[in-house]
């Protein structure tokens, strides 16, 4: 009975019985079996992939076979493979994904793909084609025009993120453009004149994008924040010191400037005083370092442009004698590399820039040439392009983000055609593309690597932005899609009142009065009758002085110091005693009564006789 009860209870509770020994497992054997299964499965997967690759290599014609025939072949192959696999152990786990089976002939399951959909293989093929032909990567399918002013746009600056553009020109204005905040009207959100009446020559954001370097025609560079408020201003040097290294700042007009690519507080400027100076934003009282370019004879030469290398180790300057001089940033005395005959002497080299790789240097000369140099072999240029007119001392040249193209602008005279933006292949230096910008010179150009957009400054006050909706990012794409904002007019609904104007006192016509009554009324009006002001009684008031003697104190003061002076004639006062002197002589007359009874007076002599009696040496010589 006990065994039957135990068995029934065990069956009810779902286990075999009570008090039996637990089952033991051999873990090593189970691990070995699992490993063998995984190895066999991986072998089968590799064999299947190799077979698919061999089939695809041997029979490329399978792409042209109809899908029905391919489906039949796949069915037969699947049946044969199923028979082969049936002999082996069954696969354990989820089924292999369809993209790993290599069966590209199966029909697509699901809704049809959109018309613009491209497979990843097609995109890779297009990318390879673009790499082979860099012209296809130029974003020039669309453009927007920003109206800076009417004079030349001589400076362009774009922050590293590509959110804000800043432009400067010969009209002394600096304008700020925010792509995210602009609408289709394309209006600048701020305009200012940071350097008063000096032309703006260079604008550049720092590598962090929080401050802007402003270089104008004066001798003091300025640093502004993102909103245009001043942060610092460089000190001016002493122009009476001969050695420019002993002055604290520039003493002549600035020509250019740029930020250090690695150190966010350091920037550089070059000037007509013959120096290239480095500065620190935190110290505006003195420069950080000074570099003095020299001519072949050791004389002072003016640097017209300057730049840092991409790693910030070298400083390059284009000089007015046609030379290009490169210094090590830590050694300011002697040049690291130099080329004396880079451009024609006496011309202004307008731009010096390094490639993104850092080993190629491009220069835009005032002799209408564009040259590339290898700084490791700095004797001769790699390539030269001539016939590129340059009328401005700040005409730009820059590399494309992939270092395959070099772009620059050309200058034209008024009415002489369109200014062009030229694209040159860096390897062959052949002109591969050009853009006709406008009927004015192309001065500034900038190709932003993140936005993949090209900014151009022209000689007629325009700043153009070229972009491609498919290849470009943000930037001009953000503002062209926004509709122009309408001016909001303040409208208020108020209750309408009808007012008769002649009911008001000011519009009411006066009644006709007689002439006598009108004259009497005017007589009572002190203004119309011109009544004089009455004398002031007592102390003065209202700016008028009161009469003297009005009070006891004023009467006493007036009589304290009386004027006792005799205002009579002195001759009459003397002659008053003449009769008494004749009758009763007392002082002088008794002395002459015996010796000279008759009075003898002096003879009156004329002026002419006096001049005649003068000696010769006293006479005036006429």
From Swiss-Prot:
Which stretches does UniProt call biased (Acidic residues)? 120-132, 604-614
Query: Gly residues composition bias: which ranges?
Result: 539-549
Alphabetized, the UniProt keywords read:
Repeat, WD repeat
Q: Where is this region: Disordered?
A: 37-141, 508-549, 602-622
> What residue spans carry the Basic and acidic residues bias annotation?
37-55, 508-533
Instruction: Tell me the Gene3D superfamilies matching this sequence.
Output: YVTN repeat-like/Quinoprotein amine dehydrogenase
Low complexity bias locations? 67-84
Family, per the entry?
A: Belongs to the WD repeat GAD-1 family.
Annotated protein name in UniProt:
WD repeat-containing protein 70
Q: What is the lineage of its organism?
A: Eukaryota, Metazoa, Chordata, Craniata, Vertebrata
Gene of this entry: wdr70
């Amino acid at each position: 009975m006990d065994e039957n009860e135990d068995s029934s209870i065990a069956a009810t509770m779902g286990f075999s019985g009570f008090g039996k020994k637990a089952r033991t497992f051999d873990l090593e054997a189970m691990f070995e079996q699992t490993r063998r299964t995984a190895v066999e499965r991986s072998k089968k997967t590799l064999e299947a992939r190799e077979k698919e690759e061999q089939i695809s290599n041997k029979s490329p014609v399978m792409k042209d076979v109809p899908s029905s025939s391919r489906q039949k072949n796949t069915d037969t192959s699947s049946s044969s493979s199923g028979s082969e696999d049936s002999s082996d152990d069954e696969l354990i786990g989820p089924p292999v994904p369809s993209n790993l089976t290599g069966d590209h002939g199966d029909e697509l399951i699901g809704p049809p793909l959109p018309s613009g959909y491209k497979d990843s293989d097609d995109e890779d093929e297009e990318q390879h084609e673009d790499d082979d032909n860099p012209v296809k990567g130029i974003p020039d399918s669309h453009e927007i025009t920003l109206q800076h002013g009417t004079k030349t746009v001589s400076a362009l600056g774009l922050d590293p993120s590509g959110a804000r553009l800043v432009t400067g020109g010969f009209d002394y204005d600096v304008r700020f453009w925010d792509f995210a905040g602009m609408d289709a009207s394309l209006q600048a959100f701020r305009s200012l004149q940071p350097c008063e009446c000096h032309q703006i020559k260079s604008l550049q954001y720092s590598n962090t994008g929080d401050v802007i370097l402003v270089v104008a025609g004066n001798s003091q560079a300025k640093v502004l924040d993102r909103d245009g408020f001043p942060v610092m201003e460089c000190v001016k040097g002493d122009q009476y010191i001969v050695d420019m290294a002993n002055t604290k700042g520039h003493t002549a007009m600035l020509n250019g400037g740029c930020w250090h690519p690695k150190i966010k507080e350091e920037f550089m400027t070059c000037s007509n005083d013959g120096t290239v100076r480095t500065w620190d934003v935190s110290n505006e009282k003195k420069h950080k370092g000074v570099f003095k370019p020299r001519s072949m004879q050791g004389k002072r030469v003016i640097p017209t442009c300057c730049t840092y290398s991409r790693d910030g180790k070298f400083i390059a300057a284009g000089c007015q004698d046609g030379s290009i001089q490169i210094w090590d940033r830590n050694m300011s005395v002697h040049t690291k590399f130099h080329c004396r005959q880079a451009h024609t002497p006496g011309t202004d080299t307008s731009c010096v820039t390094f490639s993104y790789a850092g080993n190629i240097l491009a220069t835009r000369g005032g002799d209408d040439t564009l040259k590339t140099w290898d700084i490791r072999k700095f004797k001769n240029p790699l390539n030269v392009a001539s016939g590129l007119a340059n009328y401005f001392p700040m005409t730009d040249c820059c590399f494309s983000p992939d270092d395959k193209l070099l772009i620059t602008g050309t200058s034209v005279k008024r009415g002489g055609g369109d200014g062009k933006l030229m694209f040159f292949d860096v390897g062959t230096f052949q002109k591969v593309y050009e853009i006709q910008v406008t009927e004015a010179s192309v001065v500034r150009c900038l190709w932003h690597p993140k936005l993949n957009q090209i900014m151009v400054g022209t000689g007629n006050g325009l700043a153009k932005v070229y972009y491609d909706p498919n290849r470009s990012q943000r930037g001009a794409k953000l503002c062209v899609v926004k509709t122009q904002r309408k001016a909001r007019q303040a409208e208020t609904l108020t209750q309408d009142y009808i007012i008769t104007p002649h009911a008001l006192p000011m519009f009411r016509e006066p009644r006709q009065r007689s002439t006598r009554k009108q004259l009497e009324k005017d007589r009572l009006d002190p203004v119309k009758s011109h009544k004089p002001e009455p004398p002031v009684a007592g102390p003065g008031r209202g700016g008028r002085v009161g009469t003297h003697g009005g009070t006891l104190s004023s009467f006493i003061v007036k009589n304290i110091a009386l004027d006792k002076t005799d205002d009579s004639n002195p001759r009459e006062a003397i002659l008053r005693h003449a009769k008494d002197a004749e009758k009763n002589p007392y002082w002088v007359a008794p002395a002459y009564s015996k010796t000279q009874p008759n009075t003898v007076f002096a003879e009156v002599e004329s002026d002419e006789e006096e001049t005649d009696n003068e000696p010769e040496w006293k006479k005036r010589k006429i």
